[in-house]
Amino acid sequence: IGPICRSALDCAIVFNTIRGEDGLDKTVTNAAFNYNAGSNLKDLKVGYLKNLFDNDTVNQKNNEASLATIRKLGIEPEPVELPNDLPLDAMGIILTAEGAAAFDELTRSNKDDQLVNQLKWAWPNTFRAARFIPAVEYINALRLRDILIEEYYEKTKDYDVIITPSFGGDQLGMTNLTGHPCLVVPNGFDEKNHPTSISFLGKLYGEAALISI
């Protein structure tokens, strides 16, 4: 959950309003958010997922233009690799179970029947199927998640921001499991005139650096 805005400053304003403790969710903390619109971007340590950019032939033109723009700002991103030896698909049951728990009332009340998309992998059926996830497999997935969090930290600890294509890799599911923030920015249109984007991954509680870039 996060802001959808037209400018970085708008994002900072909205994020600063919705972040932190609300007295209801005990998992939320009041972490610092020291956003400075005039910060020197050259002070940031920036990496990029070179292998994903090299393999993203669909959006290559727009990706290259985005990286060129970033370099014009005086930033020279360094190649980075994320963990790739863990079964992320197996850990997906964690996200499925958490999503189903969040929408438990919707499922129990049968109001999910009112949702239009009722295909096999649509959310209503995903939430229903989540009730059949074995507890043992869920616990084993949590153990793998701990390993993923440690490995992700070791791979990315030296960087304030990591640039990545929005699609084509496991970074979305990975950061969903580790809790690292992600900022998505439109960067043009493809041959079918569909909008394209590029993504920026940050450190835990590193939203200020993400928005500043």
Protein language model regions, located:
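Short glycine/serine-rich loop segments
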Residues: 1-18, 165, 176-199
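Short helix-loop capping/hinge segments that flank enzyme active sites or metal/cofactor-binding pockets
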Residues: 40-49, 94-149, 186, 190-197
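An extended, acidic, His-containing surface patch that forms the Zn2+-binding/catalytic region
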Residues: 150, 156-180
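Predominant activation on well-ordered alpha-helical scaffold segments within soluble catalytic domains
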Residues: 9-16, 64, 100, 104, ...
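Acyltransferase
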Residues: 55-83, 103-116, 138-159
